[in-house]
């Protein structure tokens, strides 16, 4: 994935292109959970993210909206099942391209847990960390369509 400004739409690995509409990663403020909201006012300006590849091949996802007093992005206080993704000090993530797509990625925390991958998904309009077997089983997984802003 190229560095740039993106909107991140919630999709799944089994349905990476669900059509019109959908929900997008939305910031509501520093140290608050990142939400999944429609790409409409009043949320539109809260859905702009700077995605940057770091030297180690991992990525940071930082809020790039208007009137940002300080830098924050995808982060966490704890990596437990269903813990929220928060808008905090940007952490690094692994972006794994979903096969047969050009712009859909699984966002994985680079945390070593025996036998599981820690991935970002959604639960009741809040982005949360989900745990899946590392062997690829476990069915449909949360994924994100990265739509570049010009």
UniProtKB/Swiss-Prot annotation:
Keywords: Protease inhibitor, Thiol protease inhibitor. One of its GO terms (molecular function) is cysteine-type endopeptidase inhibitor activity. It holds the Pfam family Inhibitor_I48. Promising candidate for a biopesticide. Slows growth and reduces survival of Colorado potato beetle (Leptinotarsa decemlineata) larvae in a concentration dependent manner. Younger larvae are more susceptible to the action of clitocypin. Expressed at low levels by transgenic potato reduced larval weight gain and delayed development. The inhibition of digestive cysteine proteases, intestains, by clitocypin was shown to be the underlying mode of action. InterPro entries: Prot_inh_I48_clitocypin. Gene3D superfamilies: 2.80.10.50. Uniformly expressed throughout the mature fruiting body (at mRNA and protein level). Homodimer. Belongs to the protease inhibitor I48 family. Binds and inhibits cysteine proteinases. Inhibits most strongly papain and cathepsin L, more weakly bromelain and cathepsin B while it is completely ineffective against cathepsin H. This is Clitocypin. It comes from Clitocybe nebularis. The gene is Cnc1.
